[in-house]
């Protein structure tokens, strides 16, 4: 047995792991005669009891009030002796717009009590042993605990005290005593981790345990027989990135200091909470915080998968080539996180399927075999596979032919192909999760140069077709992986399956995650932005710390993703 410990930080990431662990729960066999297809103990810990009972092998971090209706000791008989029961029984917060400051009623941060969040209908039925996801919607899934199925060990759940969860999921959390101070930048996350862990200037964690991060990780580490690696999910565009970076420094120093970097499996799924703001309309402060987070986490990890659901400016969520239906709500963390989870679940399936199991070490070696410094997976896609010999026009334009209009014809590169089956990616439904979007938009070229291409699909026939297509391109290393259960996440009753288009009442997908030269084009405006920061920009320098070091890191990574001759190389000097 080879275990994986998962660490997740913040609301959008915790929603994502909830989808993932609900999928793991669906794999549990409750009858002795059932034959398992997965090694559940890769991601789950089995309880010592007469019944089959599992708990996530995970550390979950959230802001104050971020657990919603869940009391982390609710399903456990005993409470810790030193628990501050006032924090357990009530959620306290200073709401946005409330008066704060010295002498105010909110000075301590504990004087104003918020009414307890009630369990939704799904959780009430789940407590009665009934699993019915039909009641779930965007209005009653404000918290990841609203549709969580597994019972967490109390040591898994940690909330910080200094910042409060914002019920508007697209806005950053705020300081409990100074609501104008947002939990939105790398340096604030760094400061919060230090405050929580040394007690200076803060109240620490929810139970005032200033050593909690190290000791709780140690608890789960000691429960493993043979650690396969760590998989972290964190937000790249708020303060959780800085919090994660500081925690990694401590964890690596305490537990992995004697492990060489090439033998350490430390993956980060960097998630960007999709907002109404495009990358072009984000503030300088937001952009600097993001790029600082990306660079620091890249240096600390062995692989990083940055993901961003904001499509490039010329793409539409609901065009005929998208997998998304008009029921998709970008303002819902339940919806948004399900797409990130769909991709990650394809990898989790490789990690714990009993047949053709692919370990973290195996997959990591395949990806970095050409260049160990190419650790950023910059292109990530979920693709919908065509099923059988179905209607060719349905395959081309979607299941609803009534949606076909003149705009669809204009989008076609070749009108002679109208109504014909096509194997090109332009006519295949997909969701682009990566930070490198459309090649022609970002670079002016028709395609990126791929250094390494990776694909996970459910059948060998799909892999053979992909291999044939990619061989014609003669473009980098190609890795194909088989996961027959890649679609199992759609069978879980808590997954919002109606946001995805289906073909013949089935959703057949494959996933791709590639390393290509698109990252160099992506980093170019950030290099220019950092270069223009001056010494008088104190607010910006607080985020990026050492400007010259950040520029050097950016240029070094950019060069690792260069291919061929580029006339504008001087832009990177």
Curated annotation (Swiss-Prot):
Signal peptide: none
GO cellular component terms given for this protein: cytoplasm; mitochondrion
GO biological process per UniProt: mitochondrion organization
Pfam families attached to this UniProt entry: Misat_Tub_SegII (PF10644), Tubulin_3 (PF14881)
Compartment(s) where it occurs, according to its Swiss-Prot or TrEMBL record: Mitochondrion
Main location: mitochondrion
Top-rank taxon, per record: Eukaryota
Protein name: Protein DML1
Species in which this protein is naturally found: Candida albicans (strain SC5314 / ATCC MYA-2876) (Yeast)
């Amino acid at each position: 047995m080879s275990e994986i410990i998962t660490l997740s930080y913040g609301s959008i990431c915790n929603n994502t792991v909830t989808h993932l662990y609900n999928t793991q729960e669906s794999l549990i066999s409750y009858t002795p005669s059932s034959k398992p297809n997965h090694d559940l103990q890769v991601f789950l810990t089995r309880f010592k009891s007469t019944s089959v009972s599992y708990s996530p092998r995970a550390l979950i971090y959230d802001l104050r009030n971020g657990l919603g209706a869940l009391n982390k000791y609710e399903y456990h008989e005993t409470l810790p002796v030193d628990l501050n029961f006032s924090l357990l029984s009530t959620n306290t917060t200073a709401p946005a717009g409330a008066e704060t400051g010295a002498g105010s009623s909110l000075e301590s941060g504990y004087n104003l009590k918020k009414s307890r969040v009630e369990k939704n209908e799904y959780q009430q039925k789940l407590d009665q042993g009934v699993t019915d996801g039909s009641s779930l919607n965007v209005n009653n899934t404000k918290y990841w605990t609203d549709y969580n199925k597994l019972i967490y060990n109390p040591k898994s759940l940690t909330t910080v005290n200094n910042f409060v969860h914002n019920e508007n999921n697209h806005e950053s959390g705020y300081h409990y005593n100074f609501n104008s101070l947002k939990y939105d930048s790398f340096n604030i996350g760094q400061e919060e981790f230090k405050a929580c862990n040394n007690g200076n200037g803060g109240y620490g964690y929810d139970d005032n345990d200033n050593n909690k991060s190290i000791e709780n990780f140690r608890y789960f580490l000691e429960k493993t027989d043979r650690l396969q690696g760590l998989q972290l999910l964190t937000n790249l565009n708020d303060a959780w990135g800085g919090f994660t970076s500081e925690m990694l420094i401590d964890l690596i120093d305490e537990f992995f200091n004697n492990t060489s970097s090439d033998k350490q499996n430390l993956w980060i799924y960097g998630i960007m909470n999709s907002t109404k703001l495009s990358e072009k309309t984000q503030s300088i402060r937001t952009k600097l915080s993001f790029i600082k987070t990306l660079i620091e986490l890249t240096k600390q990890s062995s692989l990083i998968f940055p993901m961003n659901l904001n499509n490039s400016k010329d793409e539409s969520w609901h065009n005929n080539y998208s997998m998304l239906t008009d029921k998709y709500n970008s303002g819902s963390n339940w919806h948004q996180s399900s797409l990130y989870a769909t991709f990650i679940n394809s990898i989790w399936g490789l990690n714990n399927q009993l047949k053709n199991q692919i370990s973290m070490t195996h997959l990591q070696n395949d990806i970095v075999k050409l260049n160990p410094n190419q650790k950023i997976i910059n292109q990530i896609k979920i693709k919908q596979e065509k099923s059988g010999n179905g209607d060719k026009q349905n395959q081309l334009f979607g299941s609803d032919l009534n949606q076909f209009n003149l705009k669809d014809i204009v989008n076609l590169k070749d009108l002679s192909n109208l109504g014909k089956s096509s194997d090109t990616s332009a006519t295949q439904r997909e969701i682009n999760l990566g930070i490198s979007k459309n090649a022609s938009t970002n670079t002016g070229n028709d395609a990126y140069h791929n250094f390494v291409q990776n694909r996970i699909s459910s059948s060998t026939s799909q892999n053979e077709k992909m291999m044939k297509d990619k061989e014609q391109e003669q473009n980098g290393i190609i890795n194909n992986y088989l996961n027959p259960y890649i679609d199992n996440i759609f069978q879980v009753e808590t997954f919002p399956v109606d946001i995805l288009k289906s073909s013949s009442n089935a959703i057949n997908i494959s996933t791709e995650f590639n390393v290509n030269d698109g990252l160099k084009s992506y980093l170019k405006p950030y290099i220019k932005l950092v270069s223009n920061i001056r010494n008088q920009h104190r607010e910006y320098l607080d985020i990026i710390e050492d400007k010259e070091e950040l520029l050097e890191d950016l240029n070094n990574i950019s060069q690792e993703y260069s291919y061929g001759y580029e006339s504008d190389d001087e832009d990177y000097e």
